[in-house]
Amino acid sequence: MAGVKALVALSFSGAIGLTFLMLGCALEDYGVYWPLFVLVFHALSPIPHFIAKRATYDSDATSSACRELAYFFTTGIVVSAFGFPVILARVAVIKWGACGLVLAGNAVIFLTIQGFFLVFGRGDDFSWEQW
């Protein structure tokens, strides 16, 4: 039952993050949909982890070059997702209020993605190993 509660909490927090992102685009004062391109970064962020998990064996080694490279690529993707709205606001494509809403949405969505891997990445009875 704890896994179901975690799944509901993760879906609720993901919905909140997407709401912030949509508010940054669709409010009447902002009305520009360029910040929606951060959804590409949200979709790309777990891919290096999936590849590293498939390519390496689960050994007790403290570090793996493949896993470290996946962390590096994931960090680059996350930093790009936070930098993209700032650059758009700096060149006056979007307003700074929209940038703030998109950054808040980014924080919530990336924390949701991290929470998913913390909850379902363990390997207990209620884990989704196919993910």
From Swiss-Prot:
It is found in: Golgi apparatus membrane; Endosome membrane. Interacts with LEPR. Interacts with RAB13. Its main location: Golgi. It is a multi-pass membrane protein. It comes from Sus scrofa. The chain crosses the membrane at residues 7-27, 32-52, 69-89, 100-120. Keywords: Endosome, Golgi apparatus, Membrane, Transmembrane, Transmembrane helix. This is Leptin receptor gene-related protein. Signal peptide: none annotated.
